[in-house]
Amino acid sequence: MGSITHNKGNQIKKKLDSFIGISNWESLSIEHDNINHQLDITLLAIIKDITNKPDYSSCTTTTTTTTITTNNNNNNNNNNVNKNEDNSNTTNNNLIKSINKEVENSSVNNNGFISMNQQKQNYHYNIPTSLKDIKSIIIKSQKLKGQLQSLKQVFKQNIIINNQEVIEQQVDAIKQQQQQQQEQQQEQEQEQQQQQDGESISLSSSTSSGITISSLSNIEYNPSIAFKLGKEFVIGNLFIDQIILFLEFLYGIALEIETNLQYWESIEPTIYYLQKSPLFWLKYYHQQLNRRIQFSNKFSELHNLKQPKPILYISNLLNKVNSFILNKQPSSQQVEQQQQQQQERDEQQQQQQQQQQQQQQHNNSHHHHHHRNENEKKKKSKRIKHPKIELLDKIQKLKSYQVVISVIIGRLTFLLDSLKINTNNNNNNNNTADNNNNNLNDNESIKRFSELMSKSSIIIFDSLLLFNELFKKNKESNDNDKKVDDDDELIKLSKDLINEIINIRNEDGDQQQQQQQQQQQQQQQQQQQQQQQQQQQQSLQLLNFKILLNNQNLINKLMEVMVKRLSGNLSIPNVFIRNWVKLSVGSVIVFFGIKYSYDNFDSFKQSAFDIRDAFIRFYHEHLEEPLLNIWNVIRYDKKSLQLADPASLQSSIDSLGRMVIDYNIDRNHLDINSTETRQHLFQLASRGDISSIMKSYESNIRSPLQNILFGDMIRLILIQIQKEKVDVDKAMVAIDKLLQANELNFQLLAAIPSAIFLALLIWQIKKLFTNQKKTLPYSQLVIFQTLRKINRTLILNNTQDQQNNNLPNFISPLLLTQINILNYSTIINNQDNNNNINNINNNNNNNNNQLIKTQFKPFEKYGTILISTNKLRSHQRFVRENTESQWFNQDVHDLESEALSNQDKIQTINRMFQTYSFLKNIK
C-alpha cells in the first residue's frame, strides 16, 4: 500500500494522542464510579495493544509512546466481558436503543451484498491462490471486528465528570508549584548564607521537582477521566485502522482486477472458444435449437403454416431430450426442499423460545430463503451466452469495478487528508490558548474530532453503498425481468443512521444555546449543564461506535463478496482450463508413446542406453577433459599438445651431416684427417646447407640413367630426401612450440561450446520452475507501462475542463445525497469554514450531474493515479542502486501528491524517463 496513506494515518493518530494527553493508562486498573471493573480491564488491554504496536509506515523514523495500529490485535480476554447495561432512562439512550434494534434487524435485498445479520457469521472462506496477498488483510479486518464487538459494553457505560473540578485541580497544582519554587529559592539563599554542601541542594531540587511532576499529572491518576478519554482514544484509533485496512484491501483488489482485465483484453476470441469444454457447446447449441424450434412453432401458429418434416423430427427429438432432463430435476429439487423444510422447522422451534427480535430475524431469514429459491430457479433457466458476448461482459464488469474502486480510493485518501488538516487546525488553535485552559481546548478538540469521525463514517458508508449499487446493476443486466426497488432496506438504514445524527446534533445545538443563556447563573446549574453536555457527547460517542461497528460488518461482507466474485467467472482460468486441448492431445500422444515403447521394449531399451552413452561420452570428451587440461596448464604448466619429438629431429640432423661428410670423403673432396673441415660441413648440413654435394648432383643429372645405374645419382637423391625430412621435422617442432604457447586458448575453445550448451539447458530448466513476474525485466516492463498509463491519464484529463478535474474543496456523499432527508445539509454541514467534510449543496436532487462532475470524476483520476503509484512501489525493490531508489521514491511521492497540478506530474514522469537507467534499456 502507498506510504502516503500510512503517513496520513500516523499523523492523525499522533494529533489525537496530543489531544488526549495521557501516556500512562494504569489508573484504569483501579475500580471507580461503581461500574463493572471488567470493562476497565478490557479497555486497558485494548489500549495496551494499540500503544505497543509500531507505526504503519516503515519509512518513518520517528517513534513516540503512542505509535498506533490495531490491525493484528487478538484479545482473548474480551470474550469474558460481563453484560452490564446502564439504567439511565434519558431520551438519548432510548433513541440509541431504538436505532440499535433497527440496525441489527435491517437487511438488504439479495441483489446487493450488504446484510446486517452478519455479526453471527464467521467469515472463514476459501481464498484462491491469486488473492493470497490480501489474506492477511482479511484476517486483520476480522480481528478488528472482534475488537469492536468486545467494546460494546464499554461504550454503553456512561460516566459524568465535572470538568470544573479538573481545572481547579490543575490551577491548584500550578499554585503549589509556584509556592514550592519560592520556598526552594528561600532555602537556596539560606544554604548559600550558611555555606552548606552542594549535595543537599541537589537533593532538595530533586524532591521539589518530583512533587511538581506528581501535582501536574493528576489527570493520569484519575480513573474516571482515563476511562472517558480512553474510549475516545480507542474509537479514534480503530476508526483510522478501519480506513487503512479498507484502503489496503481496495489496493490489493485493484491490482488483481488490473491483471485479470489485461488477460481478458489480450486474449483472442478463438482461443477463448477453445477453452470452452465440449459439454458447454452441447448445452449452448441445444439452447439455440430450442429457441429456433420455439420460434418456428409460434410463427407457424400465427400464420397457420405447416412445418416441414425435418423441423418436426428435430422438435420431437428435442422434446424427448427436454422431458428426459426435466424428469431428473424434481428428485433433486425434492431433496433440497425437504432439507430446507427440516431447517425451517428447527429454526421455528428455536425461535419460539426467543424474543420478538429473534422472530423478526427469522422472518428476514425466511425472506432470504425465498429469494434464494427464486434465484436458483432463475439460474437453472438462465440463458447461456455466446463466449464472445460473455467475454465482453467480463471486460465490462471488470472495468466498472475498476472505476468504482478508483473513486473510493481517491475519496478515502482525500478524507484522510481532510481529517489531517482539521486536526492540525485544532492543534494550532490549542497552541494559541493559555496554559490554564488547555484542558477545555483539548475537550473541544476531541469533540470536534468525534464530529468529524461521525461525518467521515457516513462517507465510508456511502462508499459501501456504491459497491452495493454496482452489484445490483450487474445482476439487473443478467436478470432483465427482475426489478429493484429504490427504497430498499439499506437506504432505510442509512436514513435511520443519518436521522439519529441529526437528532443528536439538534439536541447538541439546543444544549449549547441553553449553556450560553445560563452562563450567569449559579455553579450548580453550570455543573448540571456540563453533565447534560457530557451525556450528549457520550451518546454521540456511542453512535459513532455503532456506525463504526456497522461499517466494519459491511466491510467484512464486502471482502467476502469481492473475493468470491474475483475468484469465480472473472478470474483468470487455471492451467488445466486454459490448456485442456493441449493436455488432452499430449496425453493421447503420451499414451501411444508408452504403448509403442512397451511393444518395442528391447529396441527402446537399447536406444536409451545409446543415448546415455552418448551423453556420457559428450561429458567426458567435451567437458571433463578440457577442464582438466585447463587446470593442468594453469596450475602445473603441463603441456599436452605435441606433434614431433625433438630427439628424433636431432638424430635426423646428425644423420644428414654424416651423409654429407661421407660423400665428400668418398669422392676425395675432403681430407680425411682434417677435423676442422668435417666440423664445418657438419654445421652447414645441420643448418640445411648441402651445397658441397650440389655440384656432384648437377653433374650426375646430366646423364641420369647412366648415373642411376653406375654413378652416385641415387645416393645424392637419398641425401636430399634426408634433408627434406629434417626440414619437415623442424617445421613440426616449430608448430609444437606454437601450440604449447597457445594451449590455454585451444583448451578454452574446446570447452566453451559445451559449457554454453549446458548453461542454456540449465537456464531453460530453471526458467520452467521460476516465476517470471518476480524478475527484473518484468518489473522494468511493468514500471514502464505504469508510468505510460499515468502520463496518458494526466494528459487526457488535462485536455478537458480543468475545473472538473481538480479535486474539490470538500467531499460529500454520492448516493446518500439522493435521499430526501429534512435539514440534512444544514445540520450535517460544519458551521466552521475550516471543515471540508460533508459540505453538501442544498439542492441535492437537482444537482446530480454537477455532483458527478465534482465528486466522481476528479476522484476517479486521483484514485487511478494512487493505484498506479502503489503498483510502482511494489516493483521498487528491483531498483538496485541506492541513489536511484531514493530518487524513484521521491518521484513516486510527487505523483501521489494532490498539491501538484497535472502539468507538474507530467514533467515529473518525463524526468523519470530521462533519469533512470532501467527505463532507458527497455525495448
Swiss-Prot record:
Region (Disordered): 69-93, 182-208, 335-385
The keyword Mitochondrion belongs to this UniProt entry's keyword annotation: yes
Membrane-spanning ranges: 745-765, 808-828
Main location: mitochondrion
Secretion signal span: none
Keywords: Membrane, Mitochondrion, Transmembrane, Transmembrane helix
Coiled-coil ranges (or none): none
Segments of skewed composition (Low complexity): 349-363
Function: Involved in the mitochondrial expression of subunits 6 and 8 of the F0-F1 ATP synthase.
Family assignment from sequence similarity: Belongs to the NCA2 family.
Name this protein carries in UniProt: Nuclear control of ATPase protein 2
Gene, per the UniProt record: nca2
